[in-house]
Structures are given as structure tokens and as C-alpha cells.
């Protein structure tokens, strides 16, 4: 529902890169010092972290620096085969990527594969190494976190958030905003404080409920959709178009920015904090 072909292609690419990682946590070995970074990032610039197998957790920093640490765990894979790289942009933003194959390229927008090293793909497919990121972010720094197998959680931040996974739930809270959040297999729960600007917002899943919470009254055009589930909104709305049990288009307040919540299997809720 609303999933672009580009999004679908990126999901399949990520799946091809990551391999069947799922194994029991029992008997897994751990390297809690796989990666560490501490840097100052200017306010309104980004810390972006991309991962394929493992969780990404973000919380507030106590100082004025962004801190990123990573823990590698594995049972039968080679932890040294998974490298973690970072680079800083001219605007002060930082990108951190976990890379499972030599031919994987990571940018601010996505992972890609340059198709070199395909002879090593069978070995890659037996690599069960997971990387869990812990990130601490000071006030005013924007956050972008993406993974494939694992949860994405963001709490205690004050600026824009983009959070996404494929297999796992997403919980994203910002005292400011805006927040964008998505998954395929899992729930989405987003919370925002003030809502400045007029940027459109999107929250989506396929198998899981989607909840977005806002502080105070908002002016927006909302688009809610589910196939197997129900709608709920804490605000009175003016319905636009025909009444459809699977798709609700309505206006909140004076209307304005578009807020889109969608899933296939699950409920869709727009809540007032």
C-alpha cells in the first residue's frame, strides 16, 4: 500500500546482501568494542547509521558530542569479515555503515552492490555476524537510522528523525520533529512534540500496527489505510471523498501537510499526546 517499486527493489537488494542470518542468541560470541566514534556534529546536521543485521538504538547524549558504539555478535561467522566504516561530510554530517561484503557500497541514501566479488557470495551467505549499534545524540542533531533485521528505536532527541527496518519494530520519539518511520514486518510507533514547517509525514508497515502521536492540535490532510484492521483518530475529522472501510481521507483542522499512515495487517491510529 503506497510502497514504491524503488522501495521494493531496495528491500530485495538488502535481503540479497545480508544472507539468512537468523540464529539463536544462545552460544553466540560477542565483541563489544567493534567500533567507537565520538564527534561533534553541528545542530541541524545529521548522524546517519546504516545496518543490515542487528538493532539500532538511539538515545540522548549527556554532552555535546555524538557517540556511536557497535557490538558484533556471531556463532559460526567471521566477525572480521564485517567492517564498520564512517565518513564526515563537508556540512559536518556523519555516516556510519556496517558492511558485510567487499563489493557493498554504502551512501547516505542506500546500500548498493557493484557486483564485484560474487565468487565470495556463498561464504557471505553463511555469515551470521550481527552488529548492534548504540547511538547517543545531543540536542539539535538530526537522526537517520536504517536496518534490515532488527529493531530501530529512537528516544530523547529533539530534531528530525528518519527510522526504518524490514524485519522488526520501529519506535521513534522526538521532542521536535518531524518523524518518518517504516517497517515491513513489525509495528511502528512514532511520537512528536512541536511540528514545525509543512513537510509531509509518512508512517508505514505491512504486517503490524501503525501509531502516530502528536502534541496539541494540528492542521493536516490525513490519509489512513489498512486492509485487515481498523482506524482510530483522537481528533474530529472532516471526511473527504467516499467512505471506505479500508481507506480514510480526511481533514484535521484547517488542513495542510499530508500525513500518511498505512499497513496491510494491523490497526492505524492517530493519537493526541
Predicted regions and their residues:
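Intrinsically disordered, low-complexity terminal regions
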Residues: 2-273
Amino acid at each position: 500500500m503506497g510502497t514504491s517499486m524503488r522501495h521494493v527493489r531496495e528491500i530485495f537488494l538488502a535481503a540479497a546482501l545480508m544472507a539468512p542470518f537468523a540464529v539463536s542468541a544462545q552460544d553466540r560470541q560477542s565483541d563489544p568494542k567493534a567500533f567507537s566514534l565520538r564527534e561533534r556534529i553541528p545542530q541541524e546536521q545529521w548522524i546517519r547509521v546504516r545496518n543490515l543485521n542487528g538493532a539500532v538504538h538511539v538515545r540522548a547524549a549527556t554532552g555535546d558530542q555524538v557517540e556511536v558504539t557497535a557490538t558484533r555478535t556471531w556463532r559460526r561467522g567471521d566477525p572480521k569479515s564485517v567492517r564498520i566504516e564512517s565518513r564526515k561530510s563537508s556540512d559536518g554530517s556523519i555516516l556510519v555503515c556496517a558492511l558485510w561484503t567487499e563489493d557493498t557500497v554504502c551512501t547516505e541514501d542506500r546500500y548498493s552492490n557493484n557486483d564485484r566479488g560474487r565468487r565470495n557470495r556463498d561464504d557471505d551467505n553463511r555469515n551470521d555476524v550481527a552488529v548492534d549499534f548504540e547511538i547517543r545524540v545531543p540536542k539539535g542533531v538530526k537522526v537517520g537510522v536504517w536496518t534490515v533485521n532488527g529493531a530501530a528505536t529512537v528516544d530523547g532527541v529533539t530534531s528530525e528523525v528518519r527510522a526504518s527496518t524490514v524485519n522488526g519494530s520501529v519506535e521513534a520519539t522526538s521532542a521536535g520533529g518531524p518523524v518518518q518511520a517504516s517497517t515491513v514486518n513489525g509495528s511502528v510507533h512514532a511520537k512528536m512534540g512541536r511540528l514545525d514547517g509543512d513537510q509531509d509525514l509518512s508512517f508505514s508497515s505491512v504486517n503490524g500496527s501503525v501509531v502516530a502521536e502528536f502534541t496539541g492540535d494540528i492542521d493536516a490532510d490525513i490519509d489512513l489505510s489498512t486492509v485487515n484492521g481498523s482506524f482510530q483518530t483522537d481528533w474530529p475529522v472532516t471526511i473527504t471523498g467516499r467512505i471506505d472501510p479500508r481507506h480514510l481521507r480526511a481533514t484535521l483542522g484547517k488542513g495542510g501537510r499530508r500525513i500518511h499512515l498505512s499497513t496491510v495487517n494491523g490497526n492505524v491510529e492517530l493519537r493526541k499526546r
